Amino acid sequence: MKKGIHPELKKAKIVCACGAVYETLSTKEYMTVEICSKCHPFFTGQRKFVDTEGRVERFTKKYNWEIK
């Protein structure tokens, strides 16, 4: 590797919306994430309800579809 062209790595603190905190190396010192392995449905085995009604309504209005 060439010297002097790579960004400096620092200890990074990553905080999830569920409250989980992770430490790793990164060029940034602090990051926030919305979902992690402690709260993601794939890893927890639970399903979470995601409100997508606004997106569906926008789609049906855009393409003039009727919901049956």
Curated annotation (Swiss-Prot):
InterPro entries: Ribosomal_bL28/bL31-like_sf, Ribosomal_bL31, Ribosomal_bL31_A, Ribosomal_bL31_sf
GO cellular component: ribonucleoprotein complex; ribosome
Cofactor note: Binds 1 zinc ion per subunit.
Residues noted as binding Zn(2+) in the record, renumbered to the chain: C16, C18, C36, C39
Keyword vocabulary terms for this entry: Metal-binding, Ribonucleoprotein, Ribosomal protein, RNA-binding, rRNA-binding, Zinc
GO molecular function, one term: metal ion binding
Subunit structure and binding partners: Part of the 50S ribosomal subunit.
Family membership noted in the UniProt record: Belongs to the bacterial ribosomal protein bL31 family. Type A subfamily.
HAMAP family the UniProt entry points to: Ribosomal_bL31_1
Protein name in the entry: Large ribosomal subunit protein bL31
